[in-house]
UniProtKB/Swiss-Prot annotation:
Gene that this polypeptide is encoded by: TDA4
Domain of life: Eukaryota
Protein name per the record: Topoisomerase I damage affected protein 4
UniProt organism field: Saccharomyces cerevisiae (strain ATCC 204508 / S288c)
Segments on the Cytoplasmic face: 54-79, 132-135, 184-192, 260-279
Taxonomic lineage from the root: Eukaryota, Fungi, Dikarya, Ascomycota, Saccharomycotina
TM stretches of this protein: 33-53, 80-100, 111-131, 136-156, 163-183, 193-213, 239-259
Length: 279
């Protein structure tokens, strides 16, 4: 099987392929536009309808008594993020069977394009939330959303499609990040409303998974991708290659920054509470 193998060689096809608005277009963004739109609408409905319902059922008074509208929005956004992490980690699994040595410039298949499109739809939604509530999410999350949208759309050039699932696997740490956030919000209102053991277990899983998939694998994957690009350097679209690697470096640095914050929080929580001396 050569490096330019297409979807027919490995049997990866999008289940939504027949719903395309532009089924005969050679432009992958147009061919998969329906998946981008579907994904955006899906997550908007999840934010507006599903998340509020789930939060009322799961968190009860911790959610229903919130008076700060921004905090309630943040609750809903974190719930949507949980849904997206489950969806993303499920749909990306078949893409991990795509050999890494396939040509990063020419390789594409219908299924990987679908994964990119569904992810692009989510990150476009995420970007709209970051812009709309910039005071809440700030420059870090907005920058992350912009970079993610760009990378997903760039993969529909096509570019680096064999690596889509291998970078989206970062989302494996997202559920633990969100659970940690929910625990902090619940305990802020009612101290120890979440058992300490549950908090500790989730915290350990969060730091372990985050370190493995985002710090370790993130660095290794970036190095391997750079090596793959170097092998086909004469074919590379220069601007796309430079921006892709720049964004990889940016994302890796951002992950290191977030991991350092986790360590600081963990150290703070591990410190025993000060006790007053009895005279």
């Amino acid at each position: 099987m050569n490096a330019n193998s297409t979807t027919t060689a490995i049997g990866l096809t999008s289940p939504f392929e027949k719903l395309s608005f532009f089924p005969h277009s050679s432009n992958l963004i147009l061919a998969h536009l329906h998946e981008i739109i579907f994904s955006f609408v899906f997550y908007q409905l999840a934010f507006s309808v599903v998340a509020p319902f789930l939060n009322k059922v799961v968190f009860r008074k911790h959610y229903t008594t919130i008076r700060d509208p921004l905090l309630k929005i943040d609750f809903n956004v974190h719930t949507v993020s949980m849904i997206q992490a489950v969806v993303s980690n499920t749909v990306l699994l078949p893409t991990l069977t795509t050999p890494m040595h396939y040509n990063v410039v020419t390789y594409t298949d219908s299924y990987s394009s679908m994964v990119s499109s569904l992810s692009a739809g989510y990150f476009i939604w995420d970007l709209t939330m970051c812009v709309r509530y910039f005071k809440l999410y700030g420059l870090e999350f907005t920058g992350h959303a912009i970079g993610s949208v760009y990378v997903m759309l760039l993969s529909l050039r096509p570019f680096c499609q064999p690596w889509i699932g291998r970078f989206l696997i970062y989302e494996a740490s997202t559920p633990f990040v969100n659970i940690n956030w929910f625990i902090m919000q619940c305990n802020a209102k009612s101290k120890n409303s979440i058992p300490l053991w549950f908090n500790v277990v989730n915290g350990l899983l969060l730091m372990t998974v985050f370190f493995v998939v985002r710090i370790c694998w993130g660095s290794i994957a970036s190095a391997l991708l750079f090596r793959q690009m170097w092998k086909v350097r004469d074919e590379l679209p220069k601007f796309s290659a430079v921006t892709m690697m720049s964004l990889n470096i940016f994302m890796n640095l951002l992950n290191v920054l977030w991991f350092k914050k986790m360590i600081r929080i963990a150290k703070k929580l591990a410190k025993p509470a000060p006790t007053s001396k009895l005279d």
